């Protein structure tokens, strides 16, 4: 399986061919991304174009002899927006062709002449992983090989339908996302298309993998912080909506009599499908630009993943914000799709942080909210609607490890909650999770090696809540004003605390 049916693989999966599409305006194509073959015609060509249905992403692929193998059309708004942002981005300058030269014009003319003959790929279902056990290929000591097949996303060797790597250590031009795809390709726990494994049959056209592999894959793509990775993440998690599965031990027959009766029962891992996890792309926020302007130098540097921005020294002398600025701080905040980028968004684009220094937060507010900053930096947490450590978090707030919530409760007992944010710590709920070693499993049964999480009642938070209710004398706090939050763009607890104090 090429790990990811993305950008190009999505086209094959949906089965949309140029032959069945309205006429394309060939004189209005743009953002051409070509993959040449030395001394031969083009291998692949991707570009944006308009037809009667609107803007779409087109892809064509030729074999080594110049014969057209597949051409496809995809008009998903997320993909076309991502491709356009990638085309205009600084990191891909020189990769895209904006003014076609003679060779590219000939390729477009050839593609136009072959329009009616264009058909989808007549190969195995997208996402099929071919395995060969050791000894089958005559090479001892090799348990699995990834065979060159299909076609891949331009600039990568492992992302797409198949792979084009000469060996397992070779990577493409976009090495970061290519590495993510390669590692996800090697997930040891998966169910191939139309195959039966772990007690379930996969009726999809793509392979489904263990949730831990998908979680690592998503985190790897998000860590790259570039549009190439975002295109792949959006296609895999949002467009194709590929689910994942967790393994649970169940009692089943492990040895049968010849006449069909069960001779011996044992513990066998069974797969349980989990809902898909959405991918939050950095380019989805209009305030985030791939080509930062000189006036915003803070956006031109990669931001640290966990540590918030350092406050400039001159802010320490600023006074408390006025009533006008305090109102502005409670306005909706346009935040990127991840918590680690929300601090940058607040500093650069939020109106409450612009203008004179009198509207900025006093240093006391940051000290009072530092407990929530530690909570955001919790090493083990499960995001909303996310499956991690074989546990699905169905809530709309993150689920934290008990060590992190216990540290928060200890801080609040000693120092009290920040003024104006007395109930913020109750948003994650009164539960947390602990990690346990994987279930005992006989060697060779394909059991997951990652720890598994289980939810428990956070008694330290319950005691804190009871104490607050006793001091308050009422069961609710109607005076608490929550910060506005755009749906799908979560704000970190630290930034919520800053808005409330």
UniProtKB/Swiss-Prot annotation:
Keywords: Calcium, Cell membrane, Cilium biogenesis/degradation, Cytoplasm, Cytoskeleton, Disulfide bond, Endosome, Glycoprotein, Hydrolase, Lipid metabolism, Mast cell degranulation, Membrane, Metal-binding, Phospholipid metabolism, Secreted, Signal. Its cofactor is Ca(2+). Residues 150-291 are annotated as: Phospholipase A2-like. The keyword Ion transport does not apply. Residues 284-298 have a biased composition (Polar residues). Residues 1-19 form the signal peptide. The keyword Glycoprotein applies. SMART domains: PA2c. GO terms for biological process: arachidonate secretion; cilium assembly; high-density lipoprotein particle remodeling; low-density lipoprotein particle remodeling; mast cell degranulation; negative regulation of neuron apoptotic process; phosphatidic acid metabolic process; phosphatidylcholine metabolic process. N-glycosylation does not affect the catalytic activity, but is required for proper secretion. A nonglycosylated form was observed in several cell types. Its main location: secreted. Its EC number is 3.1.1.4. It is an enzyme of class 3 (hydrolase). Residues 119-139, 284-339 are annotated as: Disordered. Disulfide bonds join 159-181, 180-220, 187-213, 211-244. GO terms for molecular function: calcium-dependent phospholipase A2 activity; metal ion binding. It catalyses: a 1,2-diacyl-sn-glycero-3-phosphocholine + H2O = a 1-acyl-sn-glycero-3-phosphocholine + a fatty acid + H(+); 1-hexadecanoyl-2-(9Z,12Z-octadecadienoyl)-sn-glycero-3-phosphocholine + H2O = (9Z,12Z)-octadecadienoate + 1-hexadecanoyl-sn-glycero-3-phosphocholine + H(+); 1-hexadecanoyl-2-(5Z,8Z,11Z,14Z-eicosatetraenoyl)-sn-glycero-3-phosphocholine + H2O = 1-hexadecanoyl-sn-glycero-3-phosphocholine + (5Z,8Z,11Z,14Z)-eicosatetraenoate + H(+); 1-hexadecanoyl-2-(9Z,12Z-octadecadienoyl)-sn-glycero-3-phosphoethanolamine + H2O = 1-hexadecanoyl-sn-glycero-3-phosphoethanolamine + (9Z,12Z)-octadecadienoate + H(+). Secretory calcium-dependent phospholipase A2 that primarily targets extracellular phospholipids. Hydrolyzes the ester bond of the fatty acyl group attached at sn-2 position of phospholipids without apparent head group selectivity. Contributes to phospholipid remodeling of low-density lipoprotein (LDL) and high-density lipoprotein (HDL) particles. Hydrolyzes LDL phospholipids releasing unsaturated fatty acids that regulate macrophage differentiation toward foam cells. May act in an autocrine and paracrine manner. Belongs to the phospholipase A2 family. This is Group 3 secretory phospholipase A2. The lineage of its organism: Eukaryota, Metazoa, Chordata, Craniata, Vertebrata.
């Amino acid at each position: 399986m090429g790990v990811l049916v993305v950008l190009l693989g999505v086209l094959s999966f949906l089965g949309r061919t140029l032959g069945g599409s309205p006429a394309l305006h060939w004189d209005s194509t743009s953002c051409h991304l070509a993959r040449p073959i030395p001394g031969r015609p083009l291998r692949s060509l991707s570009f944006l174009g308009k037809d009667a249905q609107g803007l779409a992403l087109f892809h064509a692929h030729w074999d080594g002899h110049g014969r057209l193998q597949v051409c496809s059309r995809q008009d998903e708004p997320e993909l076309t927006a991502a491709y356009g942002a990638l085309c205009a981005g600084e990191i891909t300058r020189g990769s895209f062709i904006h003014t076609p030269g003679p060779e590219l014009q000939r390729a477009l003319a050839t593609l136009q002449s072959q329009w009616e003959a264009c058909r989808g790929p007549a190969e195995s279902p997208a996402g099929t992983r071919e395995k060969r056990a050791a000894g089958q290929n005559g090479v001892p000591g090799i348990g699995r090989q990834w065979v060159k097949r299909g076609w891949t996303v331009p600039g990568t060797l492992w992302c797409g339908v198949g792979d084009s790597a000469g060996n397992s250590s070779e990577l493409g031009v976009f090495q970061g996302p290519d590495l993510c795809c390669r590692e996800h390709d090697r997930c040891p726990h998966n169910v191939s298309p139309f195959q039966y494994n772990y007690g379930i049959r996969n009726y999809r056209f793509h392979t489904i993998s263990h949730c831990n592999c998908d979680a690592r894959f998503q985190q790897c793509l998000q860590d790259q912080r570039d549009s190439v990775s975002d295109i792949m993440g959006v296609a895999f998690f949002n467009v194709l909506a590929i689910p994942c599965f967790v393994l649970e031990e169940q009692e089943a027959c492990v040895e049968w009599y010849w006449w069909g009766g069960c001779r011996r029962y044992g513990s066998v891992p069974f797969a349980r499908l989990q809902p898909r996890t959405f991918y939050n792309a950095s380019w989805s926020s209009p305030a985030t630009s791939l080509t930062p302007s000189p006036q915003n130098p803070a956006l031109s540097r990669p931001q640290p993943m966990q540590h918030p921005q350092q406050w400039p020294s001159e802010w320490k002398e600023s006074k408390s914000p006025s009533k006008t600025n305090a109102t502005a701080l409670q306005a909706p905040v346009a935040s990127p799709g991840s918590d680690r980028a929300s601090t940058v968004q607040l500093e650069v684009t939020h109106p409450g942080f612009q203008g004179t220094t009198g509207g900025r937060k006093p240093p006391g507010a940051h000290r009072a909210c530092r407990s929530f900053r530690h909570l955001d930096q919790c090493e083990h947490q499960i995001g909303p609607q996310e499956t991690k450590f074989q546990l699905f978090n169905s809530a709309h707030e993150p689920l934290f490890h008990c060590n992190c919530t216990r540290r928060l409760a200890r801080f609040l007992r000693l120092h009290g909650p920040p003024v104006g944010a007395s109930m913020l710590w109750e948003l994650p709920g009164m539960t947390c999770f602990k990690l346990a070693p994987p279930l005992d499993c006989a060697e060779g049964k394909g059991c997951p090696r990652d720890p598994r999480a289980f939810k428990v009642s956070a008694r330290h938070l319950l005691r804190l809540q009871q104490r607050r209710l006793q001091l308050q004398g009422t069961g609710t706090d109607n005076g608490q004003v929550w910060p506005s939050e755009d749906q799908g763009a979560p704000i970190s607890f630290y930034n919520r605390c800053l808005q409330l104090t």
